[in-house]
């Protein structure tokens, strides 16, 4: 369903833009369209040269189709449908949940919580945990038992849950090899850049 929903959304937007006389459109893609093992720093011409990251493949395929659809409309109908591929975005209203956030908000929250633990600021930790409780995975449940982890839990249970995600007293553990290059872009800067692209 995921690939179908993404394809339908962008096909509807792009085709209806053309049928309603829209001459200029900005299509937001994603850097996941590039191959999993693309050389770093990444260049645009590596698109479709080797396999995609399997965990993002459906989304990437839909985004590639949208990019190619814009290209085809431009060639066939003379439209100015622009596809841009923003890098890793972060900003206001981001997802900071430890289970499923992207890399930047995950790092920010981990560092923030490690600092609070170091300072012994349990009031702020409880506020944070109530705002974004942890719904334990099977592995975490084996360590802390059943039930969500929120600010109403005892300190020991909260600390065990946070340690599971690599959050300690004034220290965080980040997963991965540290070799991949990443670029981050503030979402409001991306919004400004999008307006600039559309107006120029």
Where are these regions (language model features)?
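Short-chain dehydrogenase/reductase
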Residues: 3-7, 46, 51, 55-67, ...
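Conserved Rossmann-fold NAD(P)-dependent oxidoreductase catalytic core, especially the SDR/UDP-sugar
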Residues: 4, 11-57, 82, 95
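Active-site Tyr-X1-5-Lys
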Residues: 15, 54-87, 103-121
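Active-site pre-Tyr helix/loop in NAD(P)-dependent dehydrogenases
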Residues: 30-31, 45, 67, 86-93, ...
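Alpha-helical substrate-binding/gating segment
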Residues: 75, 89, 105-174, 182-200
